[in-house]
Amino acid sequence: AVTDFNQRNGALLQRIAEKRKEYYTREKDSAYFDDLKKLENEICRDAESEISAKPASPASIILMYEYLLNENTVELCDSLLRIMPSEAKPASLLAKIDLFIEQVRRVSVGKIFPYSVLKNEKGESVSTNTFRDIPTVVTWWASYDPASREEMKNIREIYSKYKDDKVRVVNISLDIDKESWRNRIKTDSLEWTQLIQPEEWNASSTRNLGISRIPYTMILDKTGRLEKVGLEGDDLKKYIDKMVSRIDSLESVKEKN
């Protein structure tokens, strides 16, 4: 039962709850986010073990929804759903899980980044078709969101290192208050490409890409296809470095030939 799971993992859940309370006082502390992620991964593993052991339990789908389901576990959750009998999957909760899985799969690797027209801070129109020729790092964020502002430190490092030469860096804001967005760009000296989605969260492009949280980053290859999604922090920076190194190696081979 869910109650038994919560009691058995009471200490871990308490640590997670206490860690989340520290958010606004430690929003600039990268070690804080690493610690929180480790705790959340631990509860995910426990939930997976419980669901795998008792797929017919009515509690399993609740544990999946509450503790296991996220952008990185959709395939795992889908496989676990397949071994659950229909009577253990109430329609209302199953619909929510299926919708989440569908949204994440819409942004599967290899798909072309959908076309849309955005606005920069000067009010000029910018087409996503310009995200070509070199890899592009696209990050959805909002000026009012502490986690977004924290992630900007990592995006800044990527931009400072590659300067839109080998990697293009683009932010897409979901701000409602356009003036606050412009002020944040100036205050935080966000020098790279800054765009805003005029319809915020309601935009069809936002929904079609399955954006359900911010900050959220997608990496496009030079043809505009999705190469990687959902990375942040050190994982994002390491991936970009490896990607550039791989591209440089390929270019070097071409030159020799």
Regions found by a protein language model. Give the residues of each.
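A non-transmembrane, solvent-exposed segment enriched in polar/low-complexity residues
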Residues: 1-45
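N-terminal targeting signals for export/organelle localization
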Residues: 38-109, 257
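N-terminal "domain-start" segment that seeds a small globular fold
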Residues: 95-128, 192, 239-241, 245-249
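Short active-site neighborhood of thiol/selenol oxidoreductases, capturing the structured segment around
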Residues: 127-149, 155, 168
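Loop/turn elements at helix/coil->beta-strand transitions in domains of secreted/extracellular proteins
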Residues: 132-136, 164-167, 190-192, 222
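Structural microenvironment flanking redox-active thiols in thiol-disulfide oxidoreductases
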Residues: 149-188, 200-206
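Thiol/disulfide oxidoreductase modules built on the thioredoxin-like
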Residues: 190, 199-242
